[in-house]
Amino acid sequence: MTQLEYALSGIVTKEMRIVAEYEGVDEEFILEGVKKGEIVIPSNINHKNLIPKGIGRGLSTKVNANIGTSDAYPEIEKEIEKLNVAVKAGADAVMDLSTGGDINQSRRKILENSPVPVGTVPMYQAAVESISKYGSIVAMPEEFIFEVIEEQAKDGVDFITVHCGLTFESLKKLKDNGRVMDIVSRGGSFTIAWMLHNDKENPLYKHFDRLLDIAKKYDITLSLGDGLRPGCLEDATDSAQIQELIILGELVKRARKAGVQVMVEGPGHVPIDQIEANVKLQKQLCHNAPFYVLGPIVTDIAPGYDHITSAIGGAIAAASGADFLCYVTPAEHLGLPDKEDVKEGVIAAKIAAHAADIAKGVKGAKEKDLTMARARKALNWDEQIKLSIDPDKAFKYRINKNISTAKTCSMCGKFCAMKIVSEYLGTSAMTC
């Protein structure tokens, strides 16, 4: 049985109990959320070392980190390093987007070493292997994508991105209205190329019931991908994007009816003034399914700083109701991220997630900031560093920017605001 089927039967699973304890909520709250499809717990029955996380309504906003090999950088060891960096920095999940080297081995090593849920985009592997097996992506037999999905499911993948909403109906909207950047989703572009070349409907849509059978067998959470997501601000919230979202909403109902956990992916590049509307629309059309967003990135002119542009959008999206943020690294649009980029991306997304959790009133979120404020009032440097979202960086700044024996900080010195005000208020404080 899947987590959803257990919930529908009124059974609290081990995974639900772990999530409830982590979130500081009642088990019944998790049970009801999973039952309604408003919370998912990606947890493949074959991922043995998994510490499950819940994603959805009323829970803390989660962060995903993308890792994986490329043709130019096929070394699996580097991806394991990135995995460890991401988890240490606070990633709640990772996705293996490998397209180079031994893709199967990369995925299995990541699963073996990952305590957090692992996701994939099966179409990536199907496309890469189709080139070697059949000569091109468009020559791929329909059967092959399902063989790849089944293989990844057996390995223990917890959630998969599948671009099931890419249909000839949604493509018509794209053709009729046009775009500056057309399609920027890799999985989406592979799927559309196959559809147009073969003049056949998307097999993941056409044979959605077969996909559900595989997902149900292993309790994989389906992450319904947005193959028509906007790749620049100019293309945001157009008819093609919305048409795909309507189709995904219909598929959400079919997945739930089959007992399969499902979440929905959202747009990548969106102006700030459109973010809240996008989230509200998704929640309405997709029946309050958990919303997984890439960023969204709020301006197109900041290569090298897109961890910042995405954190801005992510905070607004999550505060508006999005549940799961896919990080963006400083290397976005420029190249494959290294482990330092991975850390920067995770930290930026975690900041966005936490800021949103405060706005949403998530249990315990505001209290973290109050504890930090009290540590600052007391000028307790050790406690401030401990409470930091990135303690290592905070510690380095404290050590490198100040004389080791001094109780003052190099910013304020004898003009410390805490010291001056405390003298007049009659409260004790060290100098900062």
Swiss-Prot record:
The keyword Iron applies. Pathway: Cofactor biosynthesis; thiamine diphosphate biosynthesis. Substrate binds at residues 66, 95, 124, 163, 185-187, 226-229, 265, 292. [4Fe-4S] cluster binds at residues 409, 412, 416. It is an enzyme of class 4 (lyase). It catalyses: 5-amino-1-(5-phospho-beta-D-ribosyl)imidazole + S-adenosyl-L-methionine = 4-amino-2-methyl-5-(phosphooxymethyl)pyrimidine + CO + 5'-deoxyadenosine + formate + L-methionine + 3 H(+). Binds 1 [4Fe-4S] cluster per subunit. The cluster is coordinated with 3 cysteines and an exchangeable S-adenosyl-L-methionine. Its cofactor is [4Fe-4S] cluster. Gene3D superfamilies: 6.10.250.620, Radical SAM ThiC family, central domain. PANTHER family: PHOSPHOMETHYLPYRIMIDINE SYNTHASE, CHLOROPLASTIC, THIAMINE BIOSYNTHESIS PROTEIN THIC. Belongs to the ThiC family. This is Phosphomethylpyrimidine synthase. The lineage of its organism: Bacteria, Bacillati, Bacillota, Clostridia, Thermoanaerobacterales.
